[in-house]
Amino acid sequence: MSNVYERWKEFYEDAISRDIPGVKTAEKIAYFGIGGSGIPGEVLKLLDLPVEYKLFRSYKVNVDSKTTVVAVSYSGNTAETLAGVKRAQELGVKEIIVITSGGKLKEIAESKGYPLLSLPQGYQTRFIFPYIFTYLVRILNQSTGSNYRVQDLVDGIQDNFTMLSEVSTRIANRITGKVPIFYASDLLPIAERFKQEVNENAKYPAFFSQLPEANHNEIELYSSQQGNQFIPIVIPSDKIDEATASLINAELIYPPYKSILKNISGMFLIAGLASVKLASQLNIKAEELRIIPKIRERTHNLLMGG
Protein backbone atom coordinates (compact mmCIF):
# COMPACT_ATOMS: atom_id res chain seq x y z
CA MET A 1 0.00 0.00 0.00
CA SER A 2 3.01 2.32 0.25
CA ASN A 3 2.71 2.68 -3.52
CA VAL A 4 -0.39 4.86 -2.98
CA TYR A 5 1.67 7.34 -0.98
CA GLU A 6 4.40 7.12 -3.58
CA ARG A 7 1.82 8.43 -6.07
CA TRP A 8 1.04 11.50 -3.99
CA LYS A 9 3.08 13.81 -6.21
CA GLU A 10 0.84 12.71 -9.08
CA PHE A 11 -2.26 13.24 -6.91
CA TYR A 12 -1.25 16.81 -6.04
CA GLU A 13 -0.51 17.57 -9.68
CA ASP A 14 -3.87 16.20 -10.78
CA ALA A 15 -5.71 18.21 -8.12
CA ILE A 16 -3.93 21.38 -9.25
CA SER A 17 -4.77 20.77 -12.91
CA ARG A 18 -8.48 20.11 -12.42
CA ASP A 19 -11.02 22.83 -13.08
CA ILE A 20 -12.86 24.00 -9.99
CA PRO A 21 -16.17 25.86 -9.97
CA GLY A 22 -16.30 29.54 -9.23
CA VAL A 23 -16.95 30.36 -5.59
CA LYS A 24 -18.15 33.59 -4.04
CA THR A 25 -16.06 35.89 -1.87
CA ALA A 26 -16.26 34.58 1.68
CA GLU A 27 -16.73 36.63 4.85
CA LYS A 28 -16.55 33.54 7.04
CA ILE A 29 -15.66 29.93 6.30
CA ALA A 30 -16.85 26.83 8.14
CA TYR A 31 -15.47 23.38 7.40
CA PHE A 32 -17.59 20.26 7.93
CA GLY A 33 -15.72 16.95 7.91
CA ILE A 34 -14.66 14.06 10.12
CA GLY A 35 -11.97 11.37 10.11
CA GLY A 36 -9.88 11.39 6.96
CA SER A 37 -12.16 14.09 5.59
CA GLY A 38 -11.75 16.13 8.77
CA ILE A 39 -7.98 16.36 9.15
CA PRO A 40 -7.56 18.57 6.03
CA GLY A 41 -9.75 21.15 7.75
CA GLU A 42 -7.58 20.93 10.86
CA VAL A 43 -4.43 21.41 8.80
CA LEU A 44 -5.95 24.48 7.16
CA LYS A 45 -5.51 26.20 10.54
CA LEU A 46 -1.75 26.18 9.91
CA LEU A 47 -2.24 28.77 7.17
CA ASP A 48 -2.63 32.50 7.69
CA LEU A 49 -6.38 32.71 7.17
CA PRO A 50 -7.70 36.20 6.32
CA VAL A 51 -11.29 35.42 7.35
CA GLU A 52 -13.03 33.93 10.38
CA TYR A 53 -12.71 30.15 10.25
CA LYS A 54 -14.59 27.46 12.14
CA LEU A 55 -14.02 23.72 12.00
CA PHE A 56 -16.77 21.23 12.84
CA ARG A 57 -15.70 17.60 13.13
CA SER A 58 -19.13 16.57 14.37
CA TYR A 59 -22.77 16.74 13.36
CA LYS A 60 -23.31 19.60 15.83
CA VAL A 61 -22.69 22.79 13.85
CA ASN A 62 -23.33 26.47 14.53
CA VAL A 63 -23.13 28.81 11.55
CA ASP A 64 -25.03 31.81 10.24
CA SER A 65 -26.33 32.78 6.82
CA LYS A 66 -23.18 34.79 5.99
CA THR A 67 -20.95 31.73 6.33
CA THR A 68 -19.46 29.85 3.39
CA VAL A 69 -19.60 26.16 4.29
CA VAL A 70 -17.11 23.66 2.86
CA ALA A 71 -18.63 20.19 3.33
CA VAL A 72 -16.25 17.27 2.81
CA SER A 73 -17.09 13.57 2.78
CA TYR A 74 -15.09 11.18 0.64
CA SER A 75 -17.90 8.64 0.37
CA GLY A 76 -20.58 11.29 0.28
CA ASN A 77 -22.52 9.31 2.87
CA THR A 78 -20.86 10.35 6.14
CA ALA A 79 -23.76 10.83 8.53
CA GLU A 80 -22.17 13.56 10.63
CA THR A 81 -21.41 15.68 7.56
CA LEU A 82 -24.83 15.13 6.00
CA ALA A 83 -26.49 16.13 9.28
CA GLY A 84 -24.28 19.22 9.42
CA VAL A 85 -25.26 20.24 5.90
CA LYS A 86 -28.94 19.78 6.71
CA ARG A 87 -28.55 21.99 9.77
CA ALA A 88 -26.65 24.63 7.78
CA GLN A 89 -29.49 24.74 5.27
CA GLU A 90 -31.98 25.20 8.12
CA LEU A 91 -29.86 28.10 9.42
CA GLY A 92 -30.07 29.84 6.06
CA VAL A 93 -26.60 29.16 4.65
CA LYS A 94 -26.61 29.88 0.92
CA GLU A 95 -23.04 29.00 -0.13
CA ILE A 96 -22.15 25.35 0.49
CA ILE A 97 -19.11 24.03 -1.38
CA VAL A 98 -19.05 20.24 -1.62
CA ILE A 99 -15.98 18.01 -1.92
CA THR A 100 -16.85 14.34 -2.42
CA SER A 101 -16.55 11.29 -4.67
CA GLY A 102 -20.28 10.61 -4.79
CA GLY A 103 -23.07 9.43 -2.52
CA LYS A 104 -25.84 11.48 -0.96
CA LEU A 105 -23.68 14.58 -0.60
CA LYS A 106 -23.07 14.69 -4.35
CA GLU A 107 -26.80 14.31 -4.95
CA ILE A 108 -27.48 17.26 -2.64
CA ALA A 109 -24.88 19.42 -4.39
CA GLU A 110 -26.27 18.64 -7.82
CA SER A 111 -29.90 19.18 -6.82
CA LYS A 112 -29.16 22.49 -5.08
CA GLY A 113 -26.60 23.76 -7.58
CA TYR A 114 -23.83 23.92 -4.99
CA PRO A 115 -20.21 24.17 -6.22
CA LEU A 116 -18.98 20.56 -6.48
CA LEU A 117 -15.38 19.36 -6.49
CA SER A 118 -15.03 15.67 -7.33
CA LEU A 119 -12.64 13.18 -5.76
CA PRO A 120 -11.37 10.00 -7.48
CA GLN A 121 -13.15 6.85 -6.36
CA GLY A 122 -11.72 3.55 -5.13
CA TYR A 123 -9.49 4.64 -2.23
CA GLN A 124 -9.63 4.88 1.53
CA THR A 125 -10.23 8.48 2.59
CA ARG A 126 -6.80 8.94 4.17
CA PHE A 127 -5.10 8.23 0.85
CA ILE A 128 -6.89 11.12 -0.86
CA PHE A 129 -5.55 13.93 1.35
CA PRO A 130 -3.64 15.55 -1.57
CA TYR A 131 -6.87 16.13 -3.49
CA ILE A 132 -8.89 17.45 -0.56
CA PHE A 133 -6.20 19.77 0.75
CA THR A 134 -5.23 21.10 -2.68
CA TYR A 135 -8.88 21.90 -3.35
CA LEU A 136 -9.07 23.68 0.01
CA VAL A 137 -6.08 25.89 -0.73
CA ARG A 138 -7.47 26.73 -4.16
CA ILE A 139 -10.87 27.57 -2.64
CA LEU A 140 -9.11 29.74 -0.05
CA ASN A 141 -7.20 31.61 -2.75
CA GLN A 142 -10.34 32.16 -4.80
CA SER A 143 -12.76 33.11 -2.01
CA THR A 144 -10.50 35.27 0.17
CA GLY A 145 -7.87 36.71 -2.16
CA SER A 146 -5.11 34.66 -0.55
CA ASN A 147 -2.17 33.80 -2.78
CA TYR A 148 -0.82 30.47 -1.60
CA ARG A 149 1.41 28.72 -4.14
CA VAL A 150 -0.24 25.32 -4.57
CA GLN A 151 2.80 24.06 -6.50
CA ASP A 152 4.58 24.01 -3.12
CA LEU A 153 2.52 20.92 -2.27
CA VAL A 154 4.11 19.10 -5.20
CA ASP A 155 7.56 20.48 -4.45
CA GLY A 156 7.34 19.35 -0.82
CA ILE A 157 7.43 15.77 -2.09
CA GLN A 158 9.54 15.87 -5.23
CA ASP A 159 12.33 18.05 -3.80
CA ASN A 160 13.31 15.50 -1.12
CA PHE A 161 11.43 12.25 -1.71
CA THR A 162 14.39 10.00 -0.88
CA MET A 163 15.06 11.82 2.39
CA LEU A 164 11.38 11.75 3.36
CA SER A 165 11.25 8.01 2.70
CA GLU A 166 14.37 7.43 4.79
CA VAL A 167 12.87 9.38 7.69
CA SER A 168 9.70 7.29 7.45
CA THR A 169 11.75 4.10 7.72
CA ARG A 170 13.54 5.44 10.80
CA ILE A 171 10.25 6.33 12.47
CA ALA A 172 8.64 2.97 11.67
CA ASN A 173 11.64 1.15 13.15
CA ARG A 174 11.62 3.30 16.30
CA ILE A 175 7.91 2.73 16.87
CA THR A 176 8.06 -1.06 16.65
CA GLY A 177 7.49 -2.54 20.11
CA LYS A 178 6.55 0.82 21.66
CA VAL A 179 3.44 3.00 21.77
CA PRO A 180 4.19 6.31 20.03
CA ILE A 181 3.05 9.65 21.38
CA PHE A 182 3.50 12.44 18.84
CA TYR A 183 4.12 15.89 20.30
CA ALA A 184 3.94 19.30 18.63
CA SER A 185 3.08 22.89 19.41
CA ASP A 186 2.46 25.07 16.36
CA LEU A 187 2.35 21.98 14.12
CA LEU A 188 -0.14 20.00 16.21
CA PRO A 189 -2.33 18.97 13.23
CA ILE A 190 0.69 17.21 11.76
CA ALA A 191 1.18 15.29 15.02
CA GLU A 192 -2.48 14.31 14.91
CA ARG A 193 -2.08 13.01 11.37
CA PHE A 194 0.85 10.79 12.40
CA LYS A 195 -1.31 9.34 15.15
CA GLN A 196 -4.23 8.71 12.78
CA GLU A 197 -2.08 7.05 10.13
CA VAL A 198 -0.53 4.65 12.63
CA ASN A 199 -3.99 3.81 14.00
CA GLU A 200 -5.64 3.15 10.63
CA ASN A 201 -2.86 1.69 8.52
CA ALA A 202 -1.01 -0.34 11.16
CA LYS A 203 -3.99 -1.00 13.48
CA TYR A 204 -1.61 0.05 16.24
CA PRO A 205 -2.02 2.26 19.34
CA ALA A 206 -0.76 5.82 18.96
CA PHE A 207 -1.55 9.17 20.55
CA PHE A 208 -0.75 12.84 20.10
CA SER A 209 -0.36 15.66 22.58
CA GLN A 210 0.18 19.41 22.56
CA LEU A 211 3.26 21.28 23.66
CA PRO A 212 3.96 23.16 25.84
CA GLU A 213 0.86 21.98 27.75
CA ALA A 214 2.23 18.43 28.05
CA ASN A 215 5.34 19.86 29.73
CA HIS A 216 3.19 20.60 32.77
CA ASN A 217 1.69 17.15 33.23
CA GLU A 218 2.16 14.37 30.70
CA ILE A 219 5.94 14.26 30.41
CA GLU A 220 6.18 13.10 34.02
CA LEU A 221 5.16 9.63 32.83
CA TYR A 222 8.66 9.19 31.39
CA SER A 223 10.07 9.15 34.92
CA SER A 224 8.25 5.90 35.74
CA GLN A 225 8.60 2.28 34.74
CA GLN A 226 5.26 2.53 32.93
CA GLY A 227 6.74 5.21 30.71
CA ASN A 228 9.08 2.69 29.13
CA GLN A 229 6.26 1.33 26.97
CA PHE A 230 6.00 4.65 25.12
CA ILE A 231 8.20 6.28 22.51
CA PRO A 232 7.90 10.09 22.45
CA ILE A 233 8.24 11.67 19.00
CA VAL A 234 8.49 15.45 18.78
CA ILE A 235 7.77 17.59 15.72
CA PRO A 236 9.53 20.79 16.80
CA SER A 237 8.82 24.36 15.78
CA ASP A 238 10.66 26.24 18.55
CA LYS A 239 13.35 25.92 21.23
CA ILE A 240 10.90 24.81 23.91
CA ASP A 241 9.87 21.85 21.74
CA GLU A 242 13.53 20.93 21.30
CA ALA A 243 14.18 21.27 25.04
CA THR A 244 11.29 18.92 25.74
CA ALA A 245 12.61 16.39 23.24
CA SER A 246 16.06 16.47 24.81
CA LEU A 247 14.70 16.01 28.33
CA ILE A 248 12.53 12.99 27.54
CA ASN A 249 14.93 11.48 24.99
CA ALA A 250 12.39 11.82 22.19
CA GLU A 251 12.76 10.99 18.55
CA LEU A 252 12.69 14.16 16.43
CA ILE A 253 11.07 14.77 13.06
CA TYR A 254 12.20 18.15 11.82
CA PRO A 255 10.03 19.85 9.18
CA PRO A 256 12.43 20.08 6.23
CA TYR A 257 11.26 23.32 4.61
CA LYS A 258 10.55 27.00 5.23
CA SER A 259 7.31 26.86 3.22
CA ILE A 260 4.31 25.72 5.28
CA LEU A 261 2.68 24.04 2.27
CA LYS A 262 5.87 22.11 1.47
CA ASN A 263 6.10 21.03 5.10
CA ILE A 264 2.49 19.87 5.11
CA SER A 265 2.88 17.66 2.04
CA GLY A 266 6.32 16.43 3.08
CA MET A 267 5.41 15.61 6.68
CA PHE A 268 2.13 13.97 5.70
CA LEU A 269 4.05 11.78 3.27
CA ILE A 270 6.42 10.71 6.07
CA ALA A 271 3.41 9.81 8.23
CA GLY A 272 1.81 7.73 5.50
CA LEU A 273 4.96 5.88 4.51
CA ALA A 274 5.98 5.24 8.13
CA SER A 275 2.57 3.80 8.98
CA VAL A 276 2.46 1.37 6.05
CA LYS A 277 6.04 0.28 6.75
CA LEU A 278 5.02 -0.40 10.34
CA ALA A 279 1.98 -2.30 9.06
CA SER A 280 4.25 -4.40 6.85
CA GLN A 281 6.49 -5.22 9.81
CA LEU A 282 3.41 -6.33 11.76
CA ASN A 283 2.00 -8.29 8.80
CA ILE A 284 -1.06 -6.05 8.78
CA LYS A 285 -3.05 -5.07 5.67
CA ALA A 286 -2.88 -1.29 5.70
CA GLU A 287 -5.86 -0.69 3.43
CA GLU A 288 -8.25 -2.99 5.30
CA LEU A 289 -10.75 -1.59 7.82
CA ARG A 290 -12.97 -3.79 9.99
CA ILE A 291 -14.38 -1.82 12.91
CA ILE A 292 -14.60 1.71 11.47
CA PRO A 293 -17.17 0.74 8.79
CA LYS A 294 -19.38 -0.78 11.50
CA ILE A 295 -19.48 2.39 13.60
CA ARG A 296 -20.08 4.44 10.46
CA GLU A 297 -23.16 2.32 9.76
CA ARG A 298 -24.42 2.57 13.33
CA THR A 299 -23.87 6.33 13.37
CA HIS A 300 -25.73 6.68 10.08
CA ASN A 301 -28.68 4.74 11.48
CA LEU A 302 -28.74 6.90 14.61
CA LEU A 303 -28.48 10.25 12.83
CA MET A 304 -30.21 9.63 9.52
CA GLY A 305 -32.50 6.68 10.26
CA GLY A 306 -32.23 3.32 8.58
UniProtKB/Swiss-Prot annotation:
UniProtKB keywords: Isomerase
UniProt EC number: 5.1.3.42
UniProt similarity note: Belongs to the PGI/PMI family.
Taxonomic placement: Archaea, Thermoproteota, Thermoprotei, Sulfolobales, Sulfolobaceae
Pfam families: bact-PGI_C (PF10432), SIS (PF01380)
Signal peptide extent: none
SUPFAM superfamilies: SIS domain
Keyword Isomerase: yes
Enzyme class: isomerase
Identification of the protein by name: D-glucosamine-6-phosphate 4-epimerase
Its job: Involved in the synthesis of UDP-N-acetylgalactosamine (UDP-GalNAc). Catalyzes the conversion of glucosamine-6-phosphate (GlcN-6-P) to galactosamine-6-phosphate (GalN-6-P).
Example of a GO MF term: glucose-6-phosphate isomerase activity
